[in-house]
Amino acid sequence: MKIVGITDIHGEHNEDFYKYLKENDIDLVLVAGDITDFGPLDFVKEFMDKLYDCDVEVFAIPGNCDPAGICNAIRDAGSLCLHNNLIGFGNTVIMGYGGSNPTPFNTPGETSDDHIYESVYELLAEYDYIGNDTKPTVTILLTHAPPYNTKVDELPDGTHVGSQGVKKPIHEFQPNINICGHIHEARAIDKIGETTVVNPGMLKDGHCVLIDIDDETAEYDVNIIEF
C-alpha cells in the first residue's frame, strides 16, 4: 500500500503532483491542512475533484489558515475530515488533529497547546485502548502543527515554533509516523523516540511524503519525494 502526505496547499494547484499520483499507483492521500489561504471554501471541492481524478482516496484535516466551515467543505467534496477522529485503512490506523498552537498572526484555526494535548492524547489513547493483536498495524498521526523542538518546526533563524501539545502525546504513545506541516521552511524527517516525524513542506514547492507499507508484514518506508 502506498500513502502520500501533503500539506500547505494554500489555494494553489500543482499539476506536477496530479501527474505524480496518476503515474505511481497511490492508494491514499493525506492532507495535513491549510488547503485554502483563508478561503475561499469553493477551492476545497475543486482541489478534491482533482485528486479524485487521480483515482485515490482522500482524508484531510484543517490548518490554521483554513476558515470556519472547512470540515463541512471537505465532507461536501466527498472526502473524510479526519479532524479529532481516527479511522482504519488497510493495515493502518490514521488519527487526525488539525489547526495549530497560537501564532503571532491570530489565524482562524489556532487553539491552546493544552487543548491540542488533551485532544491528541485522547485519540492516541483511544486506539491504544482498542488495541490490535490480530495483525500488524501501522499507526499514523496526521497533524497540521509540527511537534515542538524538532527539525520539522524550525524557522530559518533557528527558532522552534511547533506544538508541545503534539509532541507530548507522541512521547507517551509512540505512533509509528507523524505527518505534519505548518512551517513551510522546515521540510525534514526527524525522530521522537520510535516515531518518524515528517514535514514535506508546501505542496507548491514540489514535495510530498511517500509511505510505502508492506501489506503482509506492515513494515514501512518513509521518504520525502520530489515531483
Segments (PLM) and residue ranges:
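N-terminal active-site segment of His-dependent metallophosphoesterases
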Residues: 1-53
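Beta-strand-turn-beta hairpins that frame and shape the catalytic cleft
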Residues: 1-4, 86-96, 134-140, 191-196, ...
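Active-site neighborhood of phospho(di)ester-bond hydrolases with catalytic His/Asp-centered motifs
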Residues: 5-8, 29-34, 57-64, 81-83, ...
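Active-site environment of divalent metal-dependent phosphoester hydrolases
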Residues: 10-16, 36-41, 64-71, 87, ...
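A general structural detector for well-ordered alpha-helical segments in enzyme core domains, enriched
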Residues: 17-20, 46-50, 119, 162-169, ...
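Conserved beta-sheet core of the metallophosphoesterase superfamily
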Residues: 53, 59, 149, 154-215
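Conserved catalytic scaffold of divalent metal-dependent phosphoesterases
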Residues: 66-162
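Short, solvent-exposed aromatic-acidic interface loops
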Residues: 222-227
